[in-house]
């Protein structure tokens, strides 16, 4: 499921929290490219890595849930006549990702890859509110994550 030709990607990686072990800019870019596949010839997006307080505040403001969450996606919606390659923003909570990886028995790298792919699919319009859409999204996520050599992210370890 790798793109035939690499997309022109501008990724603004913002690290707004302290962490001992984060993926590299190159890893984030490779996971974004994988998720975008051949959908867009070029894309601009931001990935912001945050602490629990910022995640909780954003989750409360935009989703009405007063707790931190692993990944929030904010798609960029431009008027139809404006052709910009702006995909949107992902906000990923570092402590939540680290805790989930440990609890679920996954490697931290595999879980980071999953969160980036999951968030990018949301930016592309995929959702998991309706069961049929959730199945389609999870199937695509699983294919992409397994193509990296990681196990199915939804399978119990």
Swiss-Prot record:
Which Cys residues form disulphide pairs?
Answer: none
Location of this chain's protein in the cell? Cytoplasm
Listed name of the protein: Endoribonuclease YbeY
The protein's matches in HAMAP family, at most eight in alphabetical order, are given as: Endoribonucl_YbeY
Any one GO CC term of the record = cytoplasm
Q: Which UniProt keywords apply?
A: Cytoplasm, Endonuclease, Hydrolase, Metal-binding, Nuclease, Ribosome biogenesis, rRNA processing, Zinc
**What does the record's cofactor remark say about binding?**
Binds 1 zinc ion.
InterPro entries the record matches: MetalPrtase_cat_dom_sf_prd (IPR023091), YbeY (IPR002036), YbeY_CS (IPR020549)
Q: Which PROSITE patterns match?
A: UPF0054
């Amino acid at each position: 499921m790798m793109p035939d030709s690499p997309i022109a990607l501008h990724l603004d990686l913002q690290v707004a929290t302290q962490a001992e072990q984060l993926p590299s800019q190159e890893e984030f870019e490779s996971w974004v490219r994988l998720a975008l596949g051949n959908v867009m010839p070029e894309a601009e997006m931001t990935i912001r890595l945050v602490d629990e307080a910022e995640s909780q505040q954003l989750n409360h403001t935009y989703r009405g849930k007063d707790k931190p969450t692993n990944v929030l996606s904010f798609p960029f919606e431009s008027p139809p006549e404006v052709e910009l390659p702006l995909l949107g923003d992902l906000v990923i909570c570092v402590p939540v990702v680290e805790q989930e990886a440990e609890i679920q028995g996954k490697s931290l790298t595999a879980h980071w890859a999953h969160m980036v792919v999951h968030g990018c699919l949301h930016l592309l319009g995929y959702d998991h509110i309706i069961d049929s859409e959730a199945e389609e999204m999870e199937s695509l996520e699983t294919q992409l994550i397994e193509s990296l050599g990681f196990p199915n992210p939804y399978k119990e370890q």
